[in-house]
């Protein structure tokens, strides 16, 4: 009887040791976000739009600065001829205009940063949705992002789906 129980226990031990433990492997990938923004047609168009807008606004401001420099040069020529009271008044006016030009430049930069930031934030939000939908469709458990600063220090190139996402976002942008 003891031998039967011992043999039965030994058989159960063998059977339990023979079972393989199920391990679920996760399907993962990563996207180089810097590359995504560099190669995205929409991101390039946004960048170009704000370069052009900056150039137009800068040209307007530059014309004002040129006028101010011309007045400042005339001021220096005429200061001795027109007297000290005139020079003080005109100097104060020129200083005030210089400060106004400085404020205008700061305001222009702030406006451009705010507008471009809003558009880029909207772009990033839409890209996150596209990536999420792509991940669900392809059965990914995790999709990581890397770029500057790098959050992934190493991954096999086979896990890089940046090209796939760039193609999707560019195709979607072309269709709109």
Model features per residue range: what roles?
Residues 1-4:
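Positively charged n-region of N-terminal signal peptides that target proteins for export
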Residues 6-9:
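Sec-dependent N-terminal signal peptides
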Residues 13-16:
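C-terminal motif of bacterial Sec signal peptides marking the signal peptidase cleavage site
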Residues 21-138, 142-150, 174-176:
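Amphipathic alpha-helical segments
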Residues 122-126, 156, 160-161:
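Charged, alpha-helix-enriched surfaces in structured cytosolic catalytic cores
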Residues 151-155:
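A structural signal for short loop-to-beta-strand junctions that line the ligand-binding cleft
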């Amino acid at each position: 009887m003891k031998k039967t129980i011992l043999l039965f226990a030994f058989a159960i031990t063998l059977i339990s040791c023979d079972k393989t433990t199920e391990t679920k492997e996760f399907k993962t990938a990563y996207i180089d976000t810097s590359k995504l923004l560099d190669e995205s047609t929409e991101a390039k168009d946004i960048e170009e739009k704000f370069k052009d807008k900056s150039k137009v606004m800068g040209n307007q401001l530059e014309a004002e600065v040129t006028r101010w420099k011309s007045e400042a040069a005339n001021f220096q020529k005429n200061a001795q001829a027109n007297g000290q009271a005139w020079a003080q008044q005109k100097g104060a006016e020129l200083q005030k205009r210089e400060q106004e030009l400085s404020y205008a430049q700061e305001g222009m930069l702030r406006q451009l940063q705010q507008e471009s930031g809003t558009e880029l934030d909207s772009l990033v939000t839409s890209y996150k949705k596209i990536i999420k939908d792509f991940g669900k469709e392809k059965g990914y458990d995790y999709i990581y992002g890397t770029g500057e600063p790098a959050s992934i220090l190493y991954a096999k190139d086979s896990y890089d789906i940046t090209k796939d996402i760039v193609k999707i976002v560019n195709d979607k942008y072309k269709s709109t």
